[in-house]
């Protein structure tokens, strides 16, 4: 994440928090430390950036749930996984930007799309939605700026 984009995200967050908490001095606002070195960090930065620009964005959790197996006396004897009910291959972020559905798959490092994710991408694009693979924050911001100016 370059300095300009990091500062831009910080400025957006300060503006939002100044409006929400007008009596708190800027120096005392609790600001988020954004980074894009991990998938979690990049997802958080992108989601925040979209929201702070006045659009809708949400993180999609596609992971199942771990459940304890218990005997009748309540003793835990193991764990089973309940599958997620979300669509297989769903993107990490679902957003609405300029009234259009935008799905963003976050990939950091050597991560690649699974076959299910490629099928999901085809389904979204065939339906008229926008699908984007974000590898780092700077390229996402570049895409975002072009997209909102169309």
Feature map (PLM): residue ranges:
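Catalytic phosphate/metal-binding cores of nucleic-acid and nucleotide-processing enzymes, i.e., regions
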Residues: 1-150
């Amino acid at each position: 994440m370059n300095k300009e984009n990091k500062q831009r995200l910080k400025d957006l967050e300060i503006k939002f928090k100044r409006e929400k908490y007008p009596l708190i001095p800027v120096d005392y606002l609790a600001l988020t430390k954004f980074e894009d070195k991990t998938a979690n960090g990049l997802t958080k930065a992108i989601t925040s950036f979209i929201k702070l620009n006045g659009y809708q964005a949400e993180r999609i959790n596609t992971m199942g749930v771990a459940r304890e197996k218990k005997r009748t006396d309540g003793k835990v004897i193991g764990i089973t996984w309940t599958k997620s009910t979300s669509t297989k291959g769903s993107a990490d972020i679902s957003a609405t930007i300029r009234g259009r559905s935008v799905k963003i798959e976050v990939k950091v490092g050597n991560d690649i799309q699974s076959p299910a994710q490629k099928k999901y991408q085809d389904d979204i694009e065939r339906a008229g939605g926008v699908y984007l693979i974000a590898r780092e924050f700077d390229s996402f911001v570049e895409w975002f700026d072009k997209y909102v100016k169309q």
